[in-house]
Regions:
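C-terminal and inter-domain tail/linker signature
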Residues: 1-142
Length: 142
């Protein structure tokens, strides 16, 4: 597949499930998918692991959405810089609803095989989310 085709696949995977279209996950993720994210205790495994993660966040942020801001592709890899937004109106990681609007940035590197995403490394501003929820204090300026 071309770099542009790979970017389209990854963009769809990053954006559509957050709009409620979980069916796209089965179309775009390989059954042997592994998703690495330091904010999670274990890697995500397969389409079901990906869907469960999205569902958990959508339960906490009913209007959750991700927008892909920029992508760079080379060979079988796509790097995507994205922004996630949503109103915290459900439980998340033991944190009850705060009603606060949250905006976070993240970066995902996706590896594709045969037109499907088989592995991803994601790093996003979990700490910033916790600050916006008033769970941890803002850092003092130097």
């Amino acid at each position: 597949m071309s770099s542009e085709q790979n970017k389209t696949i990854v963009r769809r995977l990053l954006e559509e499930p957050w709009k409620g279209n979980l069916k796209v996950v089965d179309e775009l993720i390989d059954r042997n998918y592994v998703g690495h994210d330091p904010s999670l205790p274990e890697p995500l495994r397969g389409p079901d692991g990906f869907k469960e993660n999205v569902s958990n966040y959508r339960a906490a942020y009913s209007d959750a959405r991700i927008t892909v801001d920029e992508q760079i592709a080379e060979g079988d890899k796509v790097a995507s810089r994205w922004t996630g937004r949503g109103k915290h109106d459900g439980d998340l990681m033991g944190i009850g609803p705060t009603g606060k609007q949250v905006t976070v940035s993240g970066l995902t590197i996706s590896r594709l095989e045969n037109g499907k995403v088989i592995e991803e490394y994601t790093n996003w501003d979990t700490f910033g989310m916790m600050q916006q929820l008033d769970v941890v204090p803002e850092l003092a300026h130097a």
